Regions:
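Catalytic glycan-binding domains that act on GlcNAc-containing polysaccharides
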Residues: 22-149
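Bacterial N-terminal signal peptides that target proteins for export
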Residues: 2-9
């Protein structure tokens, strides 16, 4: 009987540890100040990306909100066969920035950031800065999120 209870305790404890490691979206997704207050590392990543790519944090965060709703594990919904059988995803986009695999590979090659991870906010913020800076060089203003998008 004690062994049985110990198994459940270990399983429950492991589940709690895994859940605590998951990154949750911000509690107040409509307020960038509250997001940065809650997630200081996101603020630091946004400022770092701004210094490197000259893209303001509000533009960067608007991309993240639009693409993933601040979810690290965001992916496109699976297509359905016969309306209910899950099938393939329509694209390879993953993470905060919803970067496609090919575009992400281009970013890693151009920046030398070969260990970048699409589910890491810091890397996604840098990617968005890189991507938006491409739009700037095509004639769009760095502060115009709609045009850069």
């Amino acid at each position: 009987m004690k062994r049985f209870n110990l198994k459940f305790f270990i399983i429950g404890f492991a589940f709690l540890v895994i859940q605590s490691c998951a990154v949750r979206p911000p509690e107040n997704p409509d307020n960038i100040c509250m997001i940065f207050k809650e997630k200081r590392s996101w603020y630091n990543a946004a400022i770092r990306a701004e210094k490197r790519w000259k893209i303001p944090p509000y533009v960067l965060m608007s991309f993240v909100f639009q693409e993933s709703s601040y979810r690290a594990d965001a992916r496109p919904e699976r297509q359905k066969i016969l309306g209910f059988i899950p099938w393939k995803r329509p694209s390879s986009s993953v993470g905060y920035s919803q970067a496609l695999t090919k575009t992400w590979d281009d970013y890693r090659d151009e920046t030398g950031n070969s260990r970048a991870n699409r589910k890491d906010f810091k890397d996604s913020a840098d990617f968005i800065g890189w991507y938006a800076s491409k739009g700037y060089y095509q004639g769009f203003e760095r502060t115009d999120a709609r045009s850069l998008y």
